[in-house]
């Protein structure tokens, strides 16, 4: 498992963000029973940078807390059996040629939103960072929250990942 973490924001988080991100990513991969060694890229940026990325990729002209860019197109969330042929027949599109790891995708986190939302929701910055990472990992596994049913499934999964790590409000 490779987790590449880049911290590009000037404003710092006063916590061990690398450990928190690594623990959550590893737990999510284990929880979703990913059958491959995997790679995830995580970048921590400021509000201005995530605003630009959000505008460019989602046509939303405002900053956000986290953006997810899945590397795999699932038929059904986290159903690797359903896409096994696609992965094997197009390995160059899905696997890192140097490591052989499945490219699960990219996560972009906003440092200011982590701080603001931790304060707003009355919990620690550690919990907010862990929550946003778990949320984004579920997107990398193909889950979404466009309907109430999808939201309920995704929320239960991300909360279970956090509970397994002992990270609570």
Swiss-Prot record:
GO terms for molecular function: metalloendopeptidase activity; RNA endonuclease activity; zinc ion binding. One of its GO terms (cellular component) is cytoplasm. It comes from the Bacteria. Its main location: cytoplasm. One of its GO terms (biological process) is rRNA processing. It is found in: Cytoplasm. The keyword Iron does not apply. Its EC number is 3.1.-.-. The keyword Hydrolase applies. Belongs to the endoribonuclease YbeY family. HAMAP family: Endoribonucl_YbeY (MF_00009). PANTHER family: ENDORIBONUCLEASE YBEY, CHLOROPLASTIC. This is Endoribonuclease YbeY. It comes from Lachnospira eligens (strain ATCC 27750 / DSM 3376 / VPI C15-48 / C15-B4). The lineage of its organism: Bacteria, Bacillati, Bacillota, Clostridia, Lachnospirales.
């Amino acid at each position: 498992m490779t987790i590449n973490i880049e911290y590009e924001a000037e404003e710092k988080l006063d916590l061990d963000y690398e450990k928190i991100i690594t623990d959550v990513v590893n737990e999510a991969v284990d929880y979703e029973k990913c059958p491959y060694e995997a790679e995830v890229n995580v970048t921590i940026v400021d509000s201005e940078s995530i605003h630009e990325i959000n505008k460019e990729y989602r046509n939303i002209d405002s900053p956000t807390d986290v953006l997810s860019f899945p590397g795999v197109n699932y038929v059904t969330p986290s159903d690797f059996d359903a896409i096994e042929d696609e992965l094997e027949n197009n390995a160059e599109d899905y696997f890192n040629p140097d490591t052989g790891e499945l490219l699960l995708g990219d996560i972009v986190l906003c440092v200011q939103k982590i701080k603001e939302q931790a304060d707003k929701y009355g919990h620690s910055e550690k919990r907010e960072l862990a929550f946003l990472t778990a949320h984004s990992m579920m997107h990398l596994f193909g889950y979404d929250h466009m309907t109430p049913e999808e939201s309920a499934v995704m929320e239960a999964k991300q909360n279970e990942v956090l509970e397994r790590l002992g990270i609570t409000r």
